[in-house]
């Protein structure tokens, strides 16, 4: 690497032409690098003009669903067979059977006949837990001082 002369100021460098020489040198180097790394010539890009008519628009066909039994299918028709309508007694019997299987009792009246004392007291438990919390809301400093309430 050759030694570069360092000018005392920008004005001296501009007057002596040093800045122009350095810029030209860097420009030549970058042009050489670009020439070396140039890719092979690309195929020309054809830009289509919208004013020229293009081919015919694509055709859209609307197809119909096949008919079943000579009747066109409607959106309300179901392919599933209709379930037989159950009587009130049958539905109540199935409900009682399912309730007994899940909850262990056949009718909702059995649940309501329990005295109030036998029912779990959830509300009382919450109140007891709240009373057991003894949180001190006025912190003390490490030396036992009043912490944040210290007068300054």
From Swiss-Prot:
Biased composition (Basic and acidic residues): 89-100, 113-130
Family per similarity comment: Belongs to the SZRD1 family.
Domain SUZ: 42-107
Transmembrane segments: none
Name used for this protein in its record: SUZ RNA-binding domain-containing
One Pfam family from the record: SUZ
Residues annotated as domain SUZ-C: 111-152
UniProt source species: Xenopus laevis
Region of interest (Disordered), ranges: 28-152
Gene name, Swiss-Prot/TrEMBL: szrd1
Xref: PANTHER family: SUZ DOMAIN-CONTAINING PROTEIN 1
